[in-house]
UniProtKB/Swiss-Prot annotation:
The gene is aroC. Belongs to the chorismate synthase family. Homotetramer. This is Chorismate synthase. Its EC number is 4.2.3.5. One of its GO terms (biological process) is chorismate biosynthetic process. It comes from Campylobacter curvus (strain 525.92). FMN binds at residues 123-125, 233-234, 273, 288-292, 314.
Length: 354
């Protein structure tokens, strides 16, 4: 499927080495002021080729809005946009025409579809996530109307951990580090110099989300957020609130007691029973090391024969860095979708509207 969301949907298209990538946002309310400078600034945060901690593929990532915006305001029509691919080097992948890259989706996509684009992964390339970032930027323009903010940063790189998360630092950091930035940078560069890669974890928080978002059973807020984050290239695990640590606690430690003023703690991470509590929503995404590494590796070719190959091309030494920007975008899309879905959740809401 190429469409995400229920009430607010984002459909993406394009491949890594195709002419362009792009998206269509449907269900976006009319009357929202569209900030194209903010849109571009978000794309720039994810854009490749900006520094030595990302792939050297240098794309401008300029989004051209084709429809859905009139005189700077959303019109209620589908918002379509396109981002041209301008720095492909398809020859770097010619040696992969008959070979499955270890750790990539080459093998599984070929088994499913019987055909695959060997040039940088084609449709399944992380290049597509630029469209998600653009979609998330539009979602944030709507969230701004309600005082909702979403922030993400790199919490750890391998075994180097940030300590107390500092989102102000992350906003200024080349690698969006939440702390211990120099050690994280050093480890990323060490991996790159050794023709290897390294994993990372990303912390995301949502502030200002209203109480009551999410459906109680089959479209729970935490389940949809987890699915949105797991759908990002390279994410292997997602935690909400205490996450895995909750399995090590007693109920008396994990429960969030309440007073007249509200919750006394937030072990739940802002979600109970699949519905938002009004507290800060807290999520962690765990990214595997970039599977594209420049070491000799054994794999299979299309005939099922064992072969050895060495990768060429341009690749991120740590996908969690730019992945943190994508995580923010996906969370924005989910929160917007849930807010729009919630409008018809009870009679009082309907009477306010009609």
């Amino acid at each position: 499927m190429n469409t995400f969301g229920r009430k607010l949907t984002l459909t993406t298209f394009g491949e890594s080495h195709g002419a362009a990538i792009g998206g269509v946002i449907d269900g976006f309310p009319a009357g929202v002021r569209i900030d194209t400078q903010f849109l571009q600034s978000e794309l720039d945060r994810r854009r490749p080729g900006r520094n030595k901690f990302a792939t050297a593929r240098d794309e401008a990532d300029r989004a051209e809005i084709l429809s859905g915006v009139f005189e700077g305001v959303s019109s209620g029509a589908p918002i379509a946009f396109v981002i041209l691919n301008q720095n492909q080097k398809s020859n770097d992948y010619e040696n992969l025409r008959e070979i499955f890259r270890p750790g990539h989706a080459d093998f599984t996509y070929f088994k499913k579809f019987g055909i695959r684009d060997h040039r940088g992964g084609g449709r399944v390339s992380a290049r597509e996530t630029a469209v998600r970032v653009a979609g998330g930027a539009f979602a944030q323009m709507l969230l701004n109307e309600f005082g909702v903010s979403v922030k993400s940063g790199v919490l750890s790189v391998a075994d180097v951990v940030a300590g107390e998360p500092d989102f102000d630092l992350a906003s200024k950091s080349e690698i969006y580090s939440l702390g211990n930035e120099d050690a994280m940078k050093s480890l990323i560069m060490k991996a790159r110099e050794q023709h290897d890669s390294v994993g990372a974890s990303v912390l995301s928080v949502v502030d200002g989300a209203p109480t009551g978002l999410g459906e109680g059973l089959y479209y729970k807020l935490d389940a949809v957020l987890a699915a949105a984050l797991m759908g990002i290239n390279g994410v292997k695990a997602v935690e909400i609130g205490e996450g895995v640590n909750a399995s090590r606690l007693f109920g008396s430690q994990n429960n969030d007691e309440m007073s007249e003023q509200g919750f006394l703690s937030n072990h739940a991470g802002g979600i109970l029973g699949g519905i938002s509590t009004g507290e800060r929503i807290v999520l962690k995404s765990h990214f595997k090391p970039t599977p594209s590494i420049f070491k000799a590796q054994k794999t299979q070719n299309l005939k099922g024969e064992c072969v050895e190959f060495e990768l060429r091309g341009r690749h991120d030494p740590c996908i969690g860095v730019r992945g943190s920007v994508v995580a923010t975008a996906m969370i924005r899309l989910v929160i917007c979708d849930m807010m729009l879905l919630n409008l018809g959740s009870n009679l009082a809401n309907l009477k306010k509207f009609y």
